[in-house]
Amino acid sequence: MPSVQKTVVKKSHKFVIDCTAPAGKIVDVAAFEKYLHDRIKVDNKVGNLGSTVVISKDKSKIIINTTIPFSKRYLKYLTKKFLKFKQIRDFLRVVATTKNTYELRYFNIGDSESQE
């Protein structure tokens, strides 16, 4: 009986973190990209990205391409840690806009003041 070769198709994931909303350029996108590069864990090791996780920057968007199982929630966690590290967590929040996209937005402070 001939052996049958099975091909494993690697599924690629693409995540986007959109930093265009904060006017005034509060978020330094290059510093955020470096922060993600230094903090993302692969196989429980920091700095083990290799070719499995690719982080790129496009103007004010960060694009993460992975060929391994990767959690979108983990990116939200790292984004919130970066905002806390830069002490701008009080002004910005991380919102999921689509299935693979997060966006940084300001808190709606003006709406709560007008309701009181």
Curated annotation (Swiss-Prot):
Q: Which residues form a coiled coil?
A: none
Per UniProt, what is one Pfam family of this protein? Ribosomal_L22e
* Keywords annotated in UniProt: Ribonucleoprotein, Ribosomal protein
Tell me, what is an example of a GO biological process annotation in this record? Answer: cytoplasmic translation
InterPro entries in the record:
Ribosomal_eL22, Ribosomal_eL22_sf
**Listed GO CC annotations:** ribonucleoprotein complex; ribosome
One Gene Ontology MF term: structural constituent of ribosome
Q: Which family does it belong to?
A: Belongs to the eukaryotic ribosomal protein eL22 family.
Q: Which PANTHER family match?
A: 60S RIBOSOMAL PROTEIN L22, LARGE RIBOSOMAL SUBUNIT PROTEIN EL22A-RELATED
Name this polypeptide is given: Large ribosomal subunit protein eL22A
Q: Which organism is it from?
A: Dictyostelium discoideum
What is the organism lineage in this UniProt record?
Answer: Eukaryota, Amoebozoa, Evosea, Eumycetozoa, Dictyostelia
Please state the gene responsible for encoding this protein: rpl22
